[in-house]
Amino acid sequence: MVERLTGRERQQALQSIAGWREVEGRDAIARSFVFTDFNEAFGFMTRVALVAEKADHHPEWRNVYKTVEVVLTTHDAGGVTRRDIDLAAAMNAIAGQFGVA
């Protein structure tokens, strides 16, 4: 089982993944991505889904038109782990392919 990050480890990790923040009242991290249109947003989600499935680590997310809101936590560990940080970094990289920083 993957270990939860300590508060300090989480803060250090968040500095390396632009746009991500802690979720108030929950051991999770979140970010919103805004794309040009729905097609880009859905394309982003499709690419992330392939990465998430390969890693067997799936986001909580929702899409409204051109915005994708994401929450990451590792349910088995009861909070944020390295798996969440790695998936967040992958999401940032994929979003960058669409010109979203």
From Swiss-Prot:
EC number: 4.2.1.96
Gene Ontology BP, a term: tetrahydrobiopterin biosynthetic process
Top-level division of the source organism's lineage: Bacteria
This protein's record includes keyword Transferase: no
Keyword Cell membrane among UniProt keywords: no
Gene Ontology MF annotations: 4-alpha-hydroxytetrahydrobiopterin dehydratase activity
Keywords assigned by UniProt, alphabetized: Lyase
Gene3D superfamilies the record matches: Transcriptional coactivator/pterin dehydratase (3.30.1360.20)
Catalytically driven reaction(s): (4aS,6R)-4a-hydroxy-L-erythro-5,6,7,8-tetrahydrobiopterin = (6R)-L-erythro-6,7-dihydrobiopterin + H2O
PANTHER family: PTERIN-4-ALPHA-CARBINOLAMINE DEHYDRATASE
Family label: Belongs to the pterin-4-alpha-carbinolamine dehydratase family.
Name the UniProt record assigns to this protein: Putative pterin-4-alpha-carbinolamine dehydratase
